[in-house]
């Protein structure tokens, strides 16, 4: 059996069928993110943010594929507003946030925030308001789609609520600005616990804490201290600490050295995109944000690509695979595996691929090919 086939069997089999786990931060005990919603045939309601640019097109692909696969889901759609909602201080409406809180699960297309316009980031608003503390991104080589690496199979887990993304910036004097990096014990323990629980639940053997504590001794030092505390509770899992610059070099040289990586916010933003580049880009990379009380918001992390919006050229793979993560969260494992296999097989065959994957198919044609595999 070829390396690609072996990898495909692993991805579509054991690890990928596991559900995401959450952590009860008050007790430290593990709880299932896949809440006992209902059986796999009872319809549930999920919030859908089609997003900007190509978002509505790839969201339509998801709806079509889910319908073809017989997924018992009803979508509650919310769009970005045209004016800032004072309750959220962004273009996201309060009603859309309440929808996710009520449904406990959602899927989000790409959302664009104008740079330097004084608007609160839409993605940051979602993470903060919904307390989505962990961003989980599986990164794996796709059989049949050739990149520089054939054996990538790792998970990045990013602390999602603090660090340099706390939004605490100000001008000290003219020409001098200051940004505060916030690291707390509570948030660090929470994401570390999630990372080790994820590793244990998914049969992963190693957790790497990524840091720059040699320079930022207080902030990253606290993060590492919390990771060490949690690691002691999981002796069966190998724990290591890797300085972020060395981590980048090691990932590019040999990504197979890593399994699960956990890190503060900014490092996670950078490393997760680097990992996506190892397997073909953000257009192939799923993502899911985990919150407390069983909330999960899966998302496509690529841009809104306004230059091709409305031209039927967008690649829906990332949003589809994120939708698969959402289905596993909901315990719709059978439909999740069917859709996952259909996506993998369509890309592997190579007959129908969008332009970014080296093909000439439209969004509609690519989506239809996936549906045909179902």
From Swiss-Prot:
Which residues are noted in the entry as Mg(2+)-binding? 245, 269, 273
**Domain of life of the source:** Eukaryota
Q: So where does substrate get bound?
A: 127, 137, 158, 245
For this record, the Gene Ontology CC terms, alphabetical, are:
mitochondrion; plasma membrane
Q: What is its EC number?
A: 1.1.1.41
**Disulfide bridges in this chain:** none
Catalytic reaction list:
D-threo-isocitrate + NAD(+) = 2-oxoglutarate + CO2 + NADH
GO BP field: isocitrate metabolic process; tricarboxylic acid cycle
Entry keyword set: Magnesium, Manganese, Metal-binding, Mitochondrion, NAD, Oxidoreductase, Transit peptide, Tricarboxylic acid cycle
EC top class named in words: oxidoreductase
What tissues has this protein been observed in?
Ubiquitous.
Q: Which family does it belong to?
A: Belongs to the isocitrate and isopropylmalate dehydrogenases family.
According to the record's subunit comment, the protein's assembly and interactions are: Heterooligomer of catalytic and regulatory subunits.
For the site Critical for catalysis, which positions are given?
165, 212
Q: Indicate yes or no for the key word Manganese.
A: yes
Q: Where is the transit peptide?
A: 1-44
Q: How is its cofactor bound, per UniProt?
A: Binds 1 Mg(2+) or Mn(2+) ion per subunit.
The entry's protein name is Isocitrate dehydrogenase [NAD] catalytic subunit 5, mitochondrial
Q: What does this protein do?
A: Performs an essential role in the oxidative function of the citric acid cycle.
Cofactor(s) the protein requires to work = Mg(2+); Mn(2+)
Single Gene Ontology MF annotation: NAD binding
Q: Where in the cell is it found?
A: Mitochondrion
Q: Name one Pfam family in it.
A: Iso_dh
Identify the coding gene.
Answer: IDH5
């Amino acid at each position: 059996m070829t390396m690609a086939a072996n990898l495909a069997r692993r991805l579509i089999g054991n690890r990928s069928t596991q559900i995401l786990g959450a952590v009860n931060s008050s007790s430290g005990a593990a709880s299932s993110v896949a809440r006992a919603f209902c059986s796999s045939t009872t319809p549930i309601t999920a919030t859908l943010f089609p997003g900007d640019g190509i978002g509505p097109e790839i969201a339509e692909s998801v709806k079509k594929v889910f319908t073809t696969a017989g997924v018992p889901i009803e979508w509650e759609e919310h769009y970005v507003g045209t004016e800032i909602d004072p309750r959220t201080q962004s273009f996201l409406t309060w009603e859309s946030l309440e929808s996710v809180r009520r449904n406990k699960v959602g899927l989000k297309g790409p959302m664009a925030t104008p740079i330097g316009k004084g608007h609160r980031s839409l993605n940051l608003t979602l993470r903060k308001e919904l307390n989505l503390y962990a961003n989980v991104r599986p990164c794996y080589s796709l059989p049949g789609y050739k990149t520089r690496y054939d054996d990538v199979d790792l998970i990045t887990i990013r602390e999602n609520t603090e660090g340099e993304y706390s939004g605490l910036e100000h001008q000290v004097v003219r020409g001098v600005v200051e940004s505060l990096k916030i690291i707390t014990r509570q948030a660090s323990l929470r994401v570390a616990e999630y990372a080790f629980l994820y590793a244990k639940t998914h049969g992963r053997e190693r957790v790497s804490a990524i840091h720059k504590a040699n320079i930022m001794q207080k902030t990253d030092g606290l993060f590492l201290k919390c990771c060490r505390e949690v690691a002691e509770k999981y002796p069966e899992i190998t724990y290591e600490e890797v300085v972020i610059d060395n981590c980048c070099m090691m990932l590019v040289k040999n990504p197979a050295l890593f399994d699960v990586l956990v890190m503060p916010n900014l490092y996670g933003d950078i490393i997760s995109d680097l990992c996506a580049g190892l397997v073909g880009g953000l257009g192939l990379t799923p993502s899911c944000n985990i919150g407390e009380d069983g909330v999960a918001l899966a998302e496509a992390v690529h841009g809104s690509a306004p230059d091709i919006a409305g031209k039927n050229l967008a690649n829906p793979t990332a949003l589809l695979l994120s939708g698969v993560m959402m289905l596993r969260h909901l315990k719709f494992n059978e439909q999740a595996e069917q859709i996952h296999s259909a996506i993998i097989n369509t890309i592997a065959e190579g007959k129908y691929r969008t332009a970014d994957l080296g093909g000439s198919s439209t969004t509609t044609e690519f989506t239809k090919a996936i549906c045909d595999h179902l």
